[in-house]
Amino acid sequence: MLTIESSLERRRFAIGDVHGCSRTLQKMVENVLQLKPDDTLYLLGDYIDRGPDSIGVLDYLLKLRESGFDIRPLRGNHEEMLLYAVADPTSRNMWYGNGGWGTLKQLGIDSPEAIPQRYIGFLNSLPYLIITEDYVFVHAGLDFQADNPLQDTPPQFMLWSRDRLVNPSNIGNRTLVTGHTVMPLFAIQGSLSTHHITLDNGCYDKGELSCGALVALNLDTRELLVQENIERQT
């Protein structure tokens, strides 16, 4: 059964893929957004892998939640790969090849089964989809070939799709907000006037032309907020 959240008188933000950039995320939340407990923050998945501090990202999200902040994190394909690697040893190589081995090294362990239950429980709790009155949040996309994309899109499509097709009339004229596919800042900015806003600028890939920043969106004003990658600054 789908749950549609009501928007109250509070600020609402969404943040794209973080990928292990814990210092950048913290600066975005505390200095750029200046997040307050009565704000709502949606996160689009892919908190782990590729960047230098995946566990720091998870710890920070858990700390925000435990401190009473209203955060609504989604599941990304990297979280799903980790969970599959824990449940099925034959799935490990796929995760390892997408940054998972580096995440294990950050934990100081060499097997997915040794990942602390604190993190496994958190990742298992993450939904694939969040629907509000005016937005639909999903990591990668929805299947607009389906009769009802909100009901009929398979989870793997939500996590892995790179299909740019969007038909807003099939999702209640809401705007779809996704991460997953790295886009240059000018393309992200251009998406703000459409029914499909993309927020992945490849935060982990510092130095890439027009990429390498963490991107957030004020959902009420459609203002784009950008924090450059600061992971390697001393």
Task: Give residue spans per PLM region.
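Active-site neighborhood of divalent metal-dependent phosphoester bond hydrolases
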Residues: 50-133, 158-166
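Active-site environment of divalent metal-dependent phosphoester hydrolases
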Residues: 19-23, 49-52, 79-83, 144-145, ...
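Active-site-proximal beta-strand elements of phosphoester/diester hydrolases
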Residues: 12-19, 135-141, 197-199
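Conserved beta-sheet core of the metallophosphoesterase superfamily
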Residues: 154-228
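Divalent metal-coordination and catalytic microenvironments
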Residues: 17, 46, 61, 76-77, ...
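His/acidic metal-ligating clusters that form di-metal
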Residues: 115-186
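A short acidic-Thr-Gly-centered motif at the start of a beta-strand
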Residues: 1-8, 33-34, 64-66, 128-131, ...
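N-terminal active-site segment of His-dependent metallophosphoesterases
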Residues: 1-59
